[in-house]
């Protein structure tokens, strides 16, 4: 992979997501079919208002969404996909191993393992301090 420093402004050029649903802050490594990105988790996240006010924990499905968005940055930054959208079509074999809380730096890693037409399958994992927080297999459909 190639070390890069793609900031949130550049990420928003690829992804249609915006606050409060943009869950990727920076891309640090990128290759043809692989990406590593960062989500800095803060107490100011909207979801912490209800999950849970006395014990804030990032919802697992939002960790998977952050991984999907990282993979989307990779796919939508390719010139041939400019102006298209990536639709999250499914997830399999998802495991949550560690709670993600305010102050954590969530490292998002996604690798495309299979493509067939507009459908792609990605192996993804999220870590905090080098420890696995979540992993799973994500399916995408490239559209529009």
Curated annotation (Swiss-Prot):
GO terms for biological process: fatty acid biosynthetic process; lipid A biosynthetic process. Its EC number is 4.2.1.59. GO terms for molecular function: (3R)-hydroxyacyl-[acyl-carrier-protein] dehydratase activity. Its main location: cytoplasm. It is an enzyme of class 4 (lyase). Keywords: Cytoplasm, Lipid A biosynthesis, Lipid biosynthesis, Lipid metabolism, Lyase. The keyword Kinase does not apply. It catalyses: a (3R)-hydroxyacyl-[ACP] = a (2E)-enoyl-[ACP] + H2O. It is found in: Cytoplasm. It comes from the Bacteria. The active site is at 51. One of its GO terms (cellular component) is cytoplasm. InterPro entries: FabA_FabZ, FabZ, HotDog_dom_sf. Belongs to the thioester dehydratase family. FabZ subfamily. Involved in unsaturated fatty acids biosynthesis. Catalyzes the dehydration of short chain beta-hydroxyacyl-ACPs and long chain saturated and unsaturated beta-hydroxyacyl-ACPs. This is 3-hydroxyacyl-[acyl-carrier-protein] dehydratase FabZ. The gene is fabZ.
């Amino acid at each position: 992979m190639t070390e890069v420093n793609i900031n949130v402004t550049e990420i928003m050029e690829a992804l249609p997501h915006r606050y409060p649903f943009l869950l990727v802050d920076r891309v640090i490594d990128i290759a043809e079919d692989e990406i590593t990105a960062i989500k800095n988790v803060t107490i100011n996240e909207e979801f912490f208002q209800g999950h849970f006010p006395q014990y804030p924990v990032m919802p697992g499905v939002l960790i998977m969404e952050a991984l999907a968005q990282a993979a989307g940055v990779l796919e939508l930054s390719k010139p041939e996909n400019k102006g298209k959208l990536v639709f999250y079509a499914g997830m399999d074999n998802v495991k949550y191993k560690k709670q993600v809380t305010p102050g954590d730096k969530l490292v998002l890693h996604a690798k495309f393992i299979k493509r067939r037409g507009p459908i792609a399958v990605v192996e993804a994992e999220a870590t905090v301090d080098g420890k696995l927080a979540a992993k799973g297999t994500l399916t995408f459909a490239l559209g529009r």
